[in-house]
From Swiss-Prot:
Matches recorded under NCBIfam families: G6PI_arch, PRK08674.1-2
GO biological process, one term: carbohydrate metabolic process
Enzyme class: isomerase
Binding partners and assembly: Homodimer.
Protein name: Bifunctional phosphoglucose/phosphomannose isomerase
InterPro entries (UniProt xref): Glu6P/Mann6P_isomerase_C (IPR019490), SIS_dom (IPR001347), SIS_dom_sf (IPR046348), SIS_PGI/PMI_1 (IPR035484)
This enzyme's EC code(s): 5.3.1.8, 5.3.1.9
Pfam families: bact-PGI_C, SIS
Protein's job: Dual specificity isomerase that catalyzes the isomerization of both glucose-6-phosphate and mannose-6-phosphate to fructose-6-phosphate.
Disulfide bridge positions per record: none
Amino acid sequence: MEEVYKVVEGFYNQFEWEDIAKDLTPYKGIVFCGMGGSGIIGSFASKWLEHRSFNKPTFVVKDYTLPPFVDRDYLVFCISYSGNTEETLSNFEEAIGRGIKPLCITSNGKLMERAKEEGCEIYEVPKGFQPRYSLGFMLSKVLNLLGVDKDELEDAKENLKENLESLKQKGKEIANRIYGYIPVVYSTPLTAHIAERWKGQINENSKSPAYFTILPEMHHNEVMGWSNPELRNKFVYLLMFDEKDHHRVKLRVDITKKILEDFGVVPIMLKGEGNSYLARSLYLVHLADWVSVFLAELYGYDPVPVKTIERIKEELKKHA
């Protein structure tokens, strides 16, 4: 566990500003392709662009195929830490077939090999990590390519560094509250990508089921599941929000909290700290890292191995 803690502690050091910004003006929109620990990069970047009022569409592809309208007028990112993610490789080949040269974020593998063969731009990240422990390296590359301000990125990095000890402590406290229950993260539109990360980190590191859903949509269906106390009490509920959420969404967060409390459930409230949306988002992302590794320790699991995921990959290879 000590080695895992060391990697998690170094998260803030994965962020570095680089002068590599692309001119986004010529493009109709941006497409981010990736799966799992690499796929969350696209979700994060898309939401960050939306918050900056980027006036072109962004699409996150977590599948084998690109949307049919994507052509050479779109900027396409192919993100795979290992370079061997079959869905992302499929996206890459489809893009090449349409005359698109994707920007490739990877550490190695077939994606790097094919990108070199096709003359695509490659943005290499350090080898030797699990994809989920290299989010900062990959996200830093993508944000720099999208033109993040140097001050914004450096402030977010400093925010992580300054809050490291408090994040560890909060992570341990939340892990103790989650232990023995199935976590459900209720997020807002501005925090949905972070809730997705929480789910993935708890799944992979803690070897636990976990789920997330989004306000206000969940107010139109999921809330009725609370009516069944026998099932309701098997879960622990986390309410995630951002200070810049729509005022009606904030009201819905308050209403959700009150109704859960009326059912005798005390939700865990999750709000990022920081001077910018990026800083607050990364704060919550890093909190998930700590929660998930402490929860793994409580359950007696090594956070690193992902045997079932590896088994699926091996089964798929039999049908290549």
